[in-house]
Amino acid sequence: MAKVCYFTGRKTVSGNNRSHAMNQTKRTVKPNLQKVTILVDGKPKKVWASARALKSGKVERV
């Protein structure tokens, strides 16, 4: 199972670090994902949920 938010689809994205000389090196920006248990078809299931989804109330925990 990939580390992608079950509700919002947020996942790791890539970007660049920039120095004062404007040199660039690759970096990754990771979302704040938490493992939560939810009910799917009446059965408990563990999924990754972003902190933003948890705070906004999109997640109904068991």
UniProtKB/Swiss-Prot annotation:
Keywords recorded for this protein, A-Z: Ribonucleoprotein, Ribosomal protein
Keyword Ribosomal protein: yes
Family under the similarity heading: Belongs to the bacterial ribosomal protein bL28 family.
Cellular component per GO, a single term: ribonucleoprotein complex
Protein name as catalogued: Large ribosomal subunit protein bL28
Leader peptide range in chain numbering: none
PANTHER family from the UniProt entry: 50S RIBOSOMAL PROTEIN L28, LARGE RIBOSOMAL SUBUNIT PROTEIN BL28A
Name of one Pfam family that matches: Ribosomal_L28
HAMAP family: Ribosomal_bL28
NCBIfam families: L28
InterPro entries: Bacterial_rp_bL28, Ribosomal_bL28, Ribosomal_bL28/bL31-like_sf, Ribosomal_bL28_bact-type, Ribosomal_bL28_sf
